[in-house]
């Protein structure tokens, strides 16, 4: 029997595990997973590929063609006629995405795409900073994930070690703290928890434990009994 469809928004700081957890929830309930940050990464990729400077929002906007960025209903990100979903994970793109995500007009473009995409649809789980109050303010279930910066840095180090990536703990911690500062102090849609979001501190819990907690919240919201303990 298929699960009832609701829309879920997952918010929280960088490195807290939003994507991993949201993917597991999406797979469990057969929902569509959308990583909102991938759109900022795609714009950063487009600028890098086309040698567009990101130091000025005004100049950058002039070089972005109409309707150049889109999503499909498998959650893939498209730049014009190219699916770039698997081309967006490297340090330079991450760094540049963090910069352009501060620009109000860029955030407006991304938010409009995401809101148009989810309009009149259910069964979508979106994750990203500002998802719970700006991108998906009418979500049926809102979750704000949290963990202290040191815990997030340790998790990132473990992940990088597994991927055989050379990284230093202090460098990771510094990058996470810097990203937190940018997210919390930006003028447009800063990182914050809304009053209607459920706060989950993941610091002392495993990923599976958090997935289990969120699953129970979903079951409760859709009015179905959960066999999970």
Curated annotation (Swiss-Prot):
Domain of life where this protein originates: Bacteria
Question: Primary place of residence?
Answer: cytoplasm
Q: Where in the cell is it found?
A: Cytoplasm
Any one biological process term the GO annotation gives: pyrimidine nucleotide metabolic process
What EC number(s) does this enzyme carry?
A: 2.7.4.25
The protein's matches in Pfam families, at most eight in alphabetical order, are given as: Cytidylate_kin (PF02224)
Cross-referenced Gene3D superfamilies: P-loop containing nucleotide triphosphate hydrolases (3.40.50.300)
Q: What class of enzyme is it?
A: transferase
Which InterPro entries does the record cross-reference, listed alphabetically? Cytidylate_kin, Cytidylate_kinase_dom, P-loop_NTPase
Keyword Acetylation listed? The answer is no
Q: Which stretches are annotated as coiled coil?
A: none
Entry keyword set: ATP-binding, Cytoplasm, Kinase, Nucleotide-binding, Transferase
Give the catalytic activity: CMP + ATP = CDP + ADP; dCMP + ATP = dCDP + ADP
Q: Which GO terms describe its cellular component?
A: cytoplasm
Q: Which residues bind ATP?
A: 12-20
**Any one Gene Ontology molecular-function term assigned to this protein's record:** ATP binding
Q: Which family does it belong to?
A: Belongs to the cytidylate kinase family. Type 1 subfamily.
Name of the featured protein? Cytidylate kinase
Q: What is the lineage of its organism?
A: Bacteria, Bacillati, Mycoplasmatota, Mycoplasmoidales, Metamycoplasmataceae
What is the gene called? cmk
């Amino acid at each position: 029997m298929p699960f009832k469809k609701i829309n879920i928004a997952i918010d929280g700081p960088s490195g807290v595990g939003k994507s991993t957890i949201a993917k597991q929830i999406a797979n469990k309930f057969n929902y569509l997973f959308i990583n909102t940050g991938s759109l900022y990464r795609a714009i950063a990729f487009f600028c890098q590929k086309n040698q567009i400077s990101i130091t000025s929002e005004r100049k950058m906007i002039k070089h972005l063609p109409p309707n150049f960025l889109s999503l499909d209903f498998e959650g893939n990100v498209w730049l014009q006629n190219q699916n770039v979903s698997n081309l967006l994970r490297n340090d330079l793109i991450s760094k540049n995405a963090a910069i352009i995500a501060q620009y109000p007009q860029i955030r407006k473009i991304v938010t409009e795409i995401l809101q148009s995409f989810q309009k009149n649809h259910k069964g979508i789980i979106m994750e990203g900073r500002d998802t719970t109050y700006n991108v998906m303010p009418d979500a049926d279930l809102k979750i704000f994930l949290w963990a202290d910066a040191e815990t997030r840095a340790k998790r990132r180090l473990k992940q990088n070690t597994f991927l055989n990536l050379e990284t230093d703990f202090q460098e990771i911690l510094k990058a996470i703290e810097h990203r937190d500062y940018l997210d919390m102090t930006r003028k447009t849609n800063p990182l914050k928890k809304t009053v209607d979001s459920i706060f989950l501190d993941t610091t002392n819990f495993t990923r599976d434990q958090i997935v289990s907690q969120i699953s129970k919240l979903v079951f409760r919201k859709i009015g179905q009994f959960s066999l999970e303990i």
